[in-house]
Amino acid sequence: QAARERRLPKLLVLEDLRGELHGHTTWSDGTASVMEMAEAARRRGYQYWGVTDHSVGLGVVQGVDGERLRRQRQEIDAANAHFAVQGIDFHLLQGSEVEILADGSLGLPDEVLKTLDVAVASIHSAQRQDRETITARCLKAVYNPYIDILGHPTGRLLGSRPPTELDVERVLQACAETGTVVEINANPARLDLNDVYARRAVELGCKIAINCDAHATDGMDILEYGIATAR
């Protein structure tokens, strides 16, 4: 009936996205340099790309602390200057995927977070905490004024790890209240938020960011899966 009455919504398509705000380079666990990832993003028609290497606090990779972020900023500024001189409409943003530690504290202090263009807060450890503990932990990050995006909120890995016990409804309500953006992680192993929670996020008034969480130049090829979830 909606089709007959021409009331079908205009759904998101790949070409609607102008960039991503969550990706990694050789500064942490990525396999390509800042410039290599930037060029890969440009080839996809992006106008911006967020460099969000892991902060300290994630034991499996070398985290980027405040001092290394200052050095990384110089590299990003140089890349942006190169694009500007060439008249290229593309801009790198400096950020961090900030670890939400087991006690709810963050892998970077506020004085560092406030210098970033974008901060993505994510949980990678202690994922079997009980519902109240992990929800309070996540909410602490959401209410931090320097956190912009909540990354892969439920932590699931399809086929290998179930989602955490997170009270997603409470967290989405907090994101709507604070303006914290909620991620749809396009990695086919994650697709997190899933379609049901993504719809609920929109109903509550949350903003959504679709990111590939790319760790290599071809890691941006999976964006369509995030688009499909959003649709």
Where are these regions (language model features)?
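Active-site beta-strand->loop->alpha-helix modules in alpha/beta enzyme cores, enriched
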Residues: 97-101
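General small-molecule cofactor/ligand-binding pocket signal
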Residues: 93
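Charged catalytic cores and adjacent phosphate/nucleic-acid-binding surfaces used
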Residues: 1-25, 31-51, 55-90, 102-231
